[in-house]
UniProtKB/Swiss-Prot annotation:
The gene is carB. Mg(2+) 2 binds at residues 299, 301. Its cofactor is Mg(2+); Mn(2+). InterPro entries: ATP-grasp, ATP_grasp_subdomain_1, CarbamoylP_synth_lsu, CarbamoylP_synth_lsu_oligo, CarbamoylP_synth_lsu_oligo_sf, CbamoylP_synth_lsu-like_ATP-bd, CbamoylP_synth_lsu_CPSase_dom, MGS-like_dom. Its EC number is 6.3.4.16, 6.3.5.5. Residues 945-1099 form the MGS-like domain. This is Carbamoyl phosphate synthase large chain. The large subunit is composed of 2 ATP-grasp domains that are involved in binding the 2 ATP molecules needed for carbamoyl phosphate synthesis. The N-terminal ATP-grasp domain (referred to as the carboxyphosphate synthetic component) catalyzes the ATP-dependent phosphorylation of hydrogencarbonate to carboxyphosphate and the subsequent nucleophilic attack by ammonia to form a carbamate intermediate.
Length: 1099
């Protein structure tokens, strides 16, 4: 069937901020789909609240809206743009939920918008647990016994009837949010209560447990003519009971018999037929009882998903692109296979290799959270590796995670960790075999299939053989074929990694590169997409004779290093291509645009380790390697690449080293007459206490060479310092701990700057909204700044110019400054792209990373900027010619942009929500407005924390904050809010003439502050941290992964209750001040104003 001619304009809803369960895979899917729809001749409108996405770049659509993803904002966009159709299957759960709401409220009918890609009825059948169960039973498919309940009493009765354990699944939530496994009544009460709050429709499904069964997924595609293909089968190494996003998964499935696979395939067709999926991709999950062979359907997603991104990368079959074309009427036999260029999309992919995905966790960022894995997803990212065998792929995937070795435990602890899965589970399986446990015993505790366990046990037996045959060439070859890295072999043999590399080179033991081609080499692939293997002879990655640049990606998403760096990488690739270079991308993350088959000229899906990168360099011989775009991961290996004579493009390694080494950096600042906060370094607890005593408390403690403020803290007492130093020493062994004097009440600024060696251009000058001391990645920020004088801005420009010239920056860098008493202090300089580059690019309308990349290959900065000149500058600054001075004019947009963060606290009940110098956010949103108040209010809505305009406020403010907080609370009272406060805060408010109701703290009488929150009487909580209230910290003592120190105070109880009840909360005076301005703006009139992104640049 040809494409539909009755629709011309299509609205696509993005997935919003990166959260656990909904990450970069939707930017990858969305970008792919937008390209496909545009190439088919449609006009496309995209709306997303996340600026750090390629899909919101103007070149991919006809109109881009960076606006909150709510029905109110979407209706305004529909009214303005008048699309003919809405495609909701590319933006994850967020887009599906919004499509349902727009349809049910009659908005789609009102403006004549059709749903394409999935019918409303189909979405409901797939998403509504009860309807899904009924539909499956009608189709003759077995599902688990289950019952939908909307109250605790029914849940308890159902669980008694089914027998414990039971699984609780809240309706319409993402990544299993609010769900879990209850082994007894007490756990059931807790999970159901939370689940009913988390579910937007306040229902949960109570389901019989199939803990320990095997879990499989099929990625399927169907077209309007009824053609149906299975793109990929995926097997979860972890059994049922662990969310598939937290499971290690393997493709294709390894332990299914052909008969079982055919049964599953037939069932998958019946599922999508019964649900009514006429076009597009779906993911269907099955559970299989290994003892009886009983197979049940667990669930299906009628959209592209995390698994479909994985299946696309694993097979080379672009599911999102195909799904988008099917949605507009094409059939599978009309869509080419883009990898081979010869076959059609109706051919099922076949693969002659094994793919392993492993999730990346960061539970140490959330002290107090339960580390056990269950049906609620907790991982923040994932890696994928490809090998000719399961062993090889597993070895490569494990080293892609960039994790340290697991703590050594005794057998008792190992058994406990096997029975109660935690993120380190795979390490404990290996540890069990090292300690002499057999396959049967490990299987009983973990329910991992015996085939996988035998493979893993064989690896441990190989380690024993390696110990016995030191420097044996044949055993070295075998270890490489089984996925062992040079570093692992070096550790077993007690030598350096370099020595193993030399031994390999002397004996000509090198990997070959094979192609991912969707057809097991039956047809020649047109798109060079490679993986390495030691199990092969022919090298398929034959290098061209073009001049090449190799870009190192950022590896798995994690806190502090997310999608923002992938955005920069992709822009870098495009720039180098425009300058005539062949681009080589190296990355291990299946969720990203950078690992799409058609982003770079050549893609290597490989771990980002020294060994793997050097092997690609040996094969490709690039002109140079770019380490400045992938966050900290490439920077960590830059030193070793330079030692091997690899050319680093852009800022030199010497400059990188100066910026990363505090002593060298402080010396440089002194030479050029710039200030930094007084500091010292310490290699022991005694030394640290001495340094802090000299500086005076409070001090900021941090390890060297980390990203995202790992193990960073503000410390007020010697006791706290001792505790933190022990933690920091674990994080960065061999590197001293850095201790800075903490600048209280300073304004923090973030500067993204570009230089070609001569000219210096501040692309973005951002003011942090949170107080100094909150990690810049966790603070909201505003561009342009709102509280800097003209004189101060000029001084900042001079300061940045001096520093950039001294560091010899070529390309992009990020500098953090603090301003206290009109003095400028340099906090740190990062000689690489920062996480704010996409935000700045969207705020000013100039692609910062593209310009930086071109500079790295010799282009001139004023010449590159002239394309965008004249751009708005500060009021009163008139610029006729760009290169009048070596300091190029700083952009000063007329519209205000606020970047707000999203932190997954609700996934980790028990964690304190206080912000500090350790970063914990997973994603971000952007709010754009005519003034700061409008931009801030929109950013709060986009982040899922809309500020109230009426109701009651609970205030409990620390003594140190009362002077500034009381007038702000008085403003809220004047606006009609009812104020409740604890005794001390109430007294301060009453002395300012504010009417207030006093509420007892916990233990001072009932109803107390917690009762008030639980009763739903409060619409906003204002609570700042008192200095005698220590934060909970994760401390690693080497024995256990981590434990929590600190005490759970009343403040902690209030904050966690507000989080649980979904009541907006403010924990600093700065955020209160911004909120007061935003609420005042909202009271004056609607802020539901929508503007095309490109229009905001012209104002």
């Amino acid at each position: 069937m040809p494409k539909r001619e009755d629709i011309k304009r299509i609205l696509v809803i993005g997935s919003g901020p990166i959260t656990i369960g909904q990450a970069a895979e939707f930017d990858y899917s969305g970008t792919q789909a937008l390209k496909a729809l545009k190439s088919a001749g449609y006009e496309v409108i995209i709306v997303n609240s996340n600026s750090a996405t390629i899909m919101t770049d103007p070149e991919f659509s006809d109109a881009v809206y960076i606006e909150p993803l709510t029905v109110e904002f979407l209706e305004k966009i529909i009214e303005k743009e008048r699309p003919d159709a809405l495609l909701p299957t590319l933006g994850g759960q967020t887009a599906l939920n919004l499509a349902v709401e727009l349809a049910e409220r009659g908005i789609l009918d009102k403006y004549g918008v059709q749903l394409i890609g999935a019918k409303l009825e189909s979405i409901k059948k797939a998403e509504d647990r009860e309807l899904f169960k009924e539909t499956m039973e009608k189709a003759g498919l077995e599902v688990l016994r289950s019952r939908l309940v909307n109250n605790l009493a029914d849940a308890l009765e159902t669980a008694r009837e089914f027998g414990y354990p039971v699984i609780i699944r809240p309706s319409f939530t993402l990544g299993g949010t609010g769900g879990g496994i209850a082994f007894n009544e007490e756990e059931l009460r807790d999970i159901v209560t939370k689940g009913l709050i988390e579910s937007p429709v306040h229902t949960v499904l109570i389901e019989e447990s199939v803990l320990g069964w095997k879990e499989y997924e099929l990625e399927v595609v169907r077209d309007g003519a009824g053609n149906f293909i299975v793109v990929c089968s995926i097997e979860n190494l972890d059994p049922m009971g662990i969310h598939t996003g937290d499971s290690i998964t393997v493709a294709p499935a390894q332990t299914l018999t052909d008969v079982e696979y055919q049964r599953m395939r037939d069932a998958a067709y019946k599922v999508i037929d019964a649900i009514g999926i006429e076009t597009g991709g779906s993911n269907i999950q099955f559970a299989l009882d290994p003892e009886t062979g009983r197979m049940v359907v667990i669930e299906m997603n009628p959209r592209v998903s995390r698994s479909s991104a994985l299946a696309s990368k694993a097979t080379g079959y672009p599911i999102a692109k195909v799904a988008a074309l099917l949605a507009v009427g094409f059939t599978l036999d009309e869509i080419p296979n883009y990898i081979t260029g010869k076959t059609m999309a109706a051919f099922e992919p076949s693969i002659d290799y094994v793919v392993v995905k492993i999730p990346r966790f960061q539970l140490e960022k959330f002290p107090g959270a339960d580390p056990r894995l269950n049906t609620q997803m907790k991982s923040v990212g994932e890696v994928m590796a490809i090998g000719r065998t399961f062993k090889e792929a597993l070895g490569k995937a494990l080293r892609s995670l960039e994790l340290d070795a697991a703590p050594k435990l005794d057998l008792e602890h190992i058994r406990e960790h096997l029975a109660n899965p935690t993120p380190e589970r795979i390490s404990y399986v290996f540890a069990a075999f090292r300690n002499g446990m057999d396959v049967e015993e490990v299987h009983e505790l973990t329910k991992i299939d015996r085939w996988f366990l035998r493979e893993m046990k064989a690896c441990i037996e190989l380690e024993e053989e390696l110990k016995l045959k030191k420097f044996d060439v044949e055993i070295l070859k075998k270890a490489k074929q089984w996925g062992y890295s040079d570093r692992e072999i070096a550790e077993i043999w007690g030598v350096s990694e370099k020595e193993i590399r030399k031994m390999r080179e002397d004996n000509r033991i090198f990997p070959v590169y094979k192609m991912v081609d969707t057809c097991a080499a039956e047809f020649e692939a047109q798109t060079p997409y490679y993986y390495s293997t030691y199990n092969g002879v022919e090298n398929e990655a034959v290098p061209s004779d073009r001049e090449k640049i190799m870009i190192l990606g950022s590896g798995p998403n994690r806190i502090g290093q997310g999608i923002e760096f992938d955005y920069t990488n992709v822009h870098g690739v495009w720039s180098f291509q425009e300058e005539g270079y062949e681009t080589i991308m190296v990355n291990s993350n299946p969720e990203t645009v950078s690992t799409d088959y058609d982003t770079s000229d050549r893609l290597y899906f490989e771990p980002l380790t020294v060994e793997d990168v050097l092997e690609i360099v040996r094969n490709e011989k690039p002109k140079g390697v770019v380490v400045a775009f992938g966050g900290q991961t490439p920077l960590k290996i830059a030193k070793y690449l330079v030692e091997e004579k690899v050319n680093i493009i852009g800022t030199s390694f010497e400059s990188i080293e100066i910026a990363e080494d505090r002593e060298k950096f402080a010396k440089l600042l002194k030479q050029i007459g710039l200030k930094c906060p007084p500091f010292g370094t310490a290699s022991s607890v005694e030394e640290a206490l001495r340094v802090a005593e000299n500086l005076g408390y409070p001090v900021l403690v941090r390890p060297s060479y980390v990203l995202g403020g790992r193990a960073m803290a503000i410390v007020d007492t010697p006791q706290e310092l001792e505790m933190y130093v022990k933690e920091a020493a674990v994080v960065s062994p061999g590197y001293p701990v850095l201790i800075d004097k903490f600048l209280e009440d300073a304004i923090e600024l973030d500067v993204d700057v570009v230089s070609d060696g001569k000219y210096v251009w501040i692309a973005g000058l951002m003011e942090q909204i949170e107080e100094a001391g909150v990690h810049s990645g966790d603070s909201a920020c505003v561009l342009p700044p709102v509280s800097l004088s003209e004189k101060l801005v000029e001084e900042i420009e001079e300061t940045v110019y001096k520093l950039v010239k001294a560091l010899k920056i070529v390309g992009v860098a990020n500098i953090q400054l603090a301003v206290k008493d009109e003095e400028i202090y340099i906090i740190e300089a990062n000689p690489r792209a920062s996480r704010t580059v996409p935000f700045v690019s969207k705020a000013i309308g100039i692609p910062v990373a593209r310009i930086a990349a071109k500079i790295m290959v010799g282009r001139n900065l004023p010449e590159l900027l002239s394309e965008y000149f004249p751009y708005p500058t500060r009021p009163g600054v008139k610029v006729d010619k760009l290169d009048e001075s070596e300091i190029l004019p700083t952009p000063w947009p007329k519209m205000f942009s606020v970047k707000e963060v999203v932190i997954p606290f609700h996934k980790f009940p028990g964690t304190d929500v206080l912000l500090g110098p350790e970063m914990r956010s997973t994603g971000e949103v952007m709010g754009i407005g005519e003034d700061f108040a409008e931009a801030f209010a929109k950013a709060q809505i986009a982040a899922g924390n809309p500020l109230p305009t009426t109701g009651a406020i609970l205030a409990t403010v620390a003594d140190k904050d009362k002077r500034e907080a009381v007038p702000l609370l008085a403003h809220l009272a004047d606006m009609g809010f009812e104020i409740y406060a604890t005794r001390g805060t109430a007294k301060a408010l009453q002395s300012h003439g504010v009417e207030v109701k006093v509420v007892p703290k916990v233990g001072e009488g009932r109803p107390d502050v917690i009762d008030l929150l639980e009763q739903g009487k409060i619409s906003l909580v204002v609570i700042t941290q008192s200095s005698d209230e220590p934060a909970l910290v994760a401390v690693s003592h080497g024995k256990e992964p981590f434990k929590v120190e600190g005490r759970r105070t009343v403040g902690y109880m209030i904050r966690t209750t507000a989080l649980k009840r979904k009541i907006p909360y403010l924990t600093t005076v700065e955020s209160l001040r911004a909120a007061v301005a935003a609420i005042r703006k909202m009271k004056k009139g609607s802020i539901v104003k929508v503007r095309r992104l490109t229009d905001t640049w012209k104002m």
